[in-house]
Amino acid sequence: MKYSMLLLLLIISGCSNSIDVPDTSELPTLMQRGASYVDLISLPKPQGKIYVSVYDFRDQTGQYKPQPNSNFSTAVPQGGTALLTMALLDSEWFFPLERQGLQNLLTERKIIRAAQKKQDSISNHGSTLPSLLSANVMIEGGIVAYDSNIKTGGVGARYLGIGGSGQYRADQVTVNIRAVDVRSGKILTSVTTSKTILSYEVSAGAFRFVDYKELLEVELGYTNNEPVNIALMSAIDSAVIHLIVKGIEDGLWRPANPAGTENPIFRKYASETNQIL
């Protein structure tokens, strides 16, 4: 039995060497994107890009992280406006106009005008400053829901102090995007999408006496938590795709090629329907 325990210890030690431990010296990379990003950049091209404004895309959930030491940490990222703007740009269907930092932009333009009024001042913006562009469509919405532990589960077994277990947890983040006609205030279309955030843990261990006064204790575990910002970005990417597809179906905008509606990505999202619980 003693030799069997030592053999088990060697096996578990060998497994521990195969665990993919992140390298703390890794260089910064571009933000990771989900599978919906591939669909976003594979859409048919538009007949003409649409000028849109995004004033605010905020967290409307009021949810905080459940950890006792994180009472002031929100459950979802607070940079929703930046993520939505990125998705609109990546789709190549829209020209987002700066509105979140509008006050900063207006202040900078005042500085330019003040410099232009002085004859002896050198201006790098010429003698005239063009007007700001206006949007045809306003994109409204926000992060409307964050549900924790919508699914949980696990399995485990232990015999004579030796065994293993695994468990998982699923959360869900939901976003809403609305396209609003600037001239009339009419809501042209509205889309709500959800993305599941999966976390799981696998562990194994042994705790038993292998001989008189000789105790064997071994623990091995691995956890994986899907980053919330990537899940949120995927939900926003999907919402933008649905917004484009619904707009084409309703005649709000058109693809450059009429045959674009036969695009596999277009047909995939056009055929999606709301799930009925």
Q: What name fits each language-model region?
A:
Residues 50-51, 55-149, 172, 176, ...:
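N-terminal segment of the mature soluble domain
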Residues 1-8:
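Sec-dependent signal peptide recognition
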Residues 126-127, 161-165:
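Extracellular loop and loop/strand-boundary signature of outer-membrane beta-barrel proteins
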Residues 1, 35-39, 123-125:
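Short alpha-helical segments and helix-capping/turn motifs at coil-helix boundaries
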Residues 3, 72, 76, 223, ...:
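Conserved aromatic-histidine-acidic binding/catalytic patches
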Residues 15-49, 147, 154, 167-277:
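C-terminal/domain-edge helix-coil "capping" segments
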Residues 144-161:
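Charged, amphipathic alpha-helical segments
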